[in-house]
Amino acid sequence: MFNLFPPFGANTAIFNDAPQPWQVGFQDGASPTQEGITELHDSIFFYLVIICFGVLWVLSSVIVNFNSNKSQLVYKYANHGTLIELIWTITPALVLIAIAFPSFKLLYLMDEVISPSMTVKVAGHQWYWSAEYSDFINEDGESIEFDSYMVPETDLEDGQLRLLEVDNRMVVPIDTHIRFIVTGADVIHDFAVPSLGLKIDAVPGRLNQTSVLIEREGVFYGQCSEICGVYHGFMPIAIEAVTPEKYLAWIDSQA
């Protein structure tokens, strides 16, 4: 743990959304998008459990009751049943509809950029990220921009995460509609932060955009999710979400 703004005293960054060793499930969602993804996953998983047990029960019943060892005649007459055919045709269709509509709704919401209050331009390089805050101008009349490299393992301090910590974090405010415009400078990369529900391709010559609203303070980690070369696994992403007051103080420090 360490202070984001040492001159301001006890403002300590919170590592509450970092991945855990041997973690299988989702990280805690910190945006409406990730919360929606988690909810959709849980709903579909519920359907899958019922389907698996239902199919297992039918198969077990058929194996036990309709086998040639038990009766050589009974299975010969089980060759047609209009009702059961309707059931196994209509039921999967209803299940697919129950899955499809929430999925489409979430996909359209993820694709919508709703009146962003600020824009962060992100470019993927081999093998680091660069960020530009074009909404803010420093004393030289230039936008705020910086490169973000992974901190080598030998330089890590107490509390910093191996292969995830960077020298310059992307600092953004909470409770603010933020637009990320993402591109690639050389090859295809992928800008992904699981706890924020962000995953967008960084393609050279193309601008892709997505939006996010972060609901709480914290440090949110991600990695390039598109194989981009020999050091693909060494270009992490670290987004630090702070209150608007701390964010403005950070902007002043960058200017």
UniProtKB/Swiss-Prot annotation:
Segments in the Mitochondrial matrix topological domain: 65-80
Pfam families recorded: COX2, COX2_TM
Subunit structure comment from the entry: Component of the cytochrome c oxidase (complex IV, CIV), a multisubunit enzyme composed of a catalytic core of 3 subunits and several supernumerary subunits. The complex exists as a monomer or a dimer and forms supercomplexes (SCs) in the inner mitochondrial membrane with ubiquinol-cytochrome c oxidoreductase (cytochrome b-c1 complex, complex III, CIII).
EC class: translocase
GO molecular function: copper ion binding; cytochrome-c oxidase activity
Protein's gene: COX2
Gene Ontology biological-process annotations: ATP synthesis coupled electron transport
Residues in compartment: Mitochondrial intermembrane: 17-43, 102-255
Entries under SUPFAM superfamilies matching the protein: Cupredoxins, Cytochrome c oxidase subunit II-like, transmembrane region
Binding site for Cu cation A1: 189, 224, 228, 235
Required cofactor(s): Cu cation
Protein name: Cytochrome c oxidase subunit 2
Catalytic activity reported: 4 Fe(II)-[cytochrome c] + O2 + 8 H(+)(in) = 4 Fe(III)-[cytochrome c] + 2 H2O + 4 H(+)(out)
